[in-house]
């Protein structure tokens, strides 16, 4: 396609309506029609990236292959489209301002007074068009975080207004709003949507398509009313009702011809149907599963979004193993030797979750010991893997005071130590070992059986590592180091071959699992959990 087309996705009425899912679904449908698509997220907060944000506030921090700490929506983009995103796919207000201020300090603006318009808006526009200009995508979908009406969003909306004016038919705005249901009146109310669109119109943007989020179906009359009062075409009002799974959304959008409407409005031919065969096959597998696999997630964060990618990876793996997933959250802060049997005895497998800091760490040791001694399939990820190693040192190697330098700087047996290159680091943000690194697998391991190859590449986010001083002792006692980074000799994977499935990875495999290509380790873990 000669020119890149830009689709902007904004949200109104309330946050957390699922702009990321709608953006991903649009991308999925366009990709299924043969177009080359990418998605980017603009977050209006002033942090440079979400790397230092509290998971309680913001959910998980996603990591791209090039080592950028990003918004969890990038996980949705990758899972829905099977693409790899980079630092350029997630921009924050903090990065926009930093870039402009750096240019001002260099003298790039030749003494001009730096203002929101044009300097900040020009920088936003440059970033919007960056991926399209560099990689010649057919479509760049840009999700704007936050809600229309927020002060923080105004520079982004002004940038969209300008881009729509500059690009003409090559730019389109999809506005997602919420239609509440009043139980007392037994009625859906469209007034908040009308006000949200008026707010958007007041900054000079007329949405081309409206997606209405609701718990209930909207009838044709209601959709016609919204079209009339919001000044959009009738066929450009689409409903997005709650679904049993987010992976149903692209199908529902296609049934309402959202993809056709977009192509028509952007002056592109509408030929044939999108190829959604593999997607529909996945959904068919998901809905036809009758048996259930119960997995415990042992971690300290109670917000489910803090483990979003792990949950999605487990769900995908369960589907491909013809099982439904039932997840039980176990708060590691309250897990003790006294109650661990009650919490974990009836689950089929356990994931010891990643995290940072002292809180809840002892509960993870308790879980690792219980699953090791009861031969229960166990998957430790990042800090979870480190907990497995520490527990093994304490209870098998006999180092009762073994620990990580992160938890106890004075531990005499630092089986987990700070990485050499991290010792001089003072800043917290963006300074960890981040992004994709090589790993070579032992061909005699369960991990190799899962991957079916010796060389893999996985994404990391950590400062601490397995201490190779203790490696020989671990191996002799039965915990094998089966995945090694060829450059640094860093231990990436540990496993106990004598147990059914007891594997810990320093990397985050959940970032590489997609709907149509589930991660081999999650597939293998679920397979072990369901085998009696």
Segments (PLM) and residue ranges:
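Active-site proximal loops enriched in glycine and acidic residues that flank catalytic Cys/His/Asp
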Residues: 11, 41, 214, 241, ...
């Amino acid at each position: 396609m000669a020119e890149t087309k830009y689709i902007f996705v904004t949200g109104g009425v309330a946050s957390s309506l699922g702009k990321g899912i709608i953006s991903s679904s649009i991308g999925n449908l366009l990709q299924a029609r043969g177009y080359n698509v990418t998605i980017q997220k603009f977050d209006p907060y002033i942090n440079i990236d979400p790397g230092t944000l509290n998971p309680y506030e913001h959910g998980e921090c996603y990591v791209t292959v090039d080592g950028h700490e990003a918004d969890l929506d990038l996980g949705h983009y990758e899972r829905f489209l099977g693409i790899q995103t980079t630092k350029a796919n997630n921009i924050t207000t903090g990065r926009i301002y930093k870039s402009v201020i750096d240019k001002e300090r260099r003298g790039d603006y030749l003494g001009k007074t730096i203002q929101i318009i044009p300097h900040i808006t020009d920088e936003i526009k440059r970033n919007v068009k960056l991926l399209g200009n560099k990689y010649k995508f057919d479509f760049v979908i840009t999700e704007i975080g936050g809600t229309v009406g927020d002060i923080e969003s105004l520079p982004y909306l002004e940038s969209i207004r300008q881009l729509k004016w500059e690009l003409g038919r090559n730019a389109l705005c999809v506005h997602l709003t919420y239609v509440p249901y009043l139980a007392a009146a037994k009625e859906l109310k469209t007034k908040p949507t009308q006000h949200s669109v008026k707010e958007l119109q007041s900054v000079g943007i007329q949405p081309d398509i409206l997606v209405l989020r609701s718990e209930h179906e909207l009838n044709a009359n209601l959709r016609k009313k919204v079209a009339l009062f919001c000044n959009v075409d009738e066929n450009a009002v689409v409903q997005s009702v709650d679904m049993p799974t987010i992976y149903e959304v692209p199908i529902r959008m296609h049934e309402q011809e959202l993809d056709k409407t977009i192509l028509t409005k952007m002056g592109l031919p509408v030929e044939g149907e999108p190829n959604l065969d593999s997607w529909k096959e996945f959904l068919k597998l998901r809905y036809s599963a009758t048996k259930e696999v119960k997995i415990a997630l042992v971690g300290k964060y109670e917000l489910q979004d803090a483990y979003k990618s792990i949950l999605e990876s487990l769900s995908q793996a369960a589907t491909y193993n013809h099982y439904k997933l039932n997840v039980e959250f176990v708060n590691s802060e309250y897990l003790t030797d006294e109650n661990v049997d009650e919490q974990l005895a009836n689950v089929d497998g356990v994931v010891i979750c990643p995290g940072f800091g002292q809180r809840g760490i002892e509960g993870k040791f308790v879980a690792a010991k219980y699953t090791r001694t009861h031969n229960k399939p166990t998957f430790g990820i990042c800090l979870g893997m480190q907990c497995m190693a520490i527990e093994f040192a304490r209870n098998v190697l006999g180092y009762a005071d073994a620990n990580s330098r992160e938890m106890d700087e004075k531990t005499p047996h630092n089986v987990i130590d700070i990485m050499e290159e991290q010792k001089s680091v003072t800043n917290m943000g963006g300074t960890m070992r981040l992004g994709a690194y090589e790993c070579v697998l032992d061909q005699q391991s369960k991990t190799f059986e899962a991957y079916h190859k010796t060389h893999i590449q996985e994404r990391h986010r950590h400062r601490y590592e397995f201490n190779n001083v203790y490696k020989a002792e671990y191996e002799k006692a039965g915990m094998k180091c089966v995945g090694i980074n060829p450059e640094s000799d860093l231990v990436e994977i540990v496993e106990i071959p004598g147990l059914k499935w007891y594997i810990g990875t320093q990397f985050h495999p959940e970032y590489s699992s997609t709907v149509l290509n589930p991660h081999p380790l999650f597939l293998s873990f679920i397979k072990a959990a369901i085998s009696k």
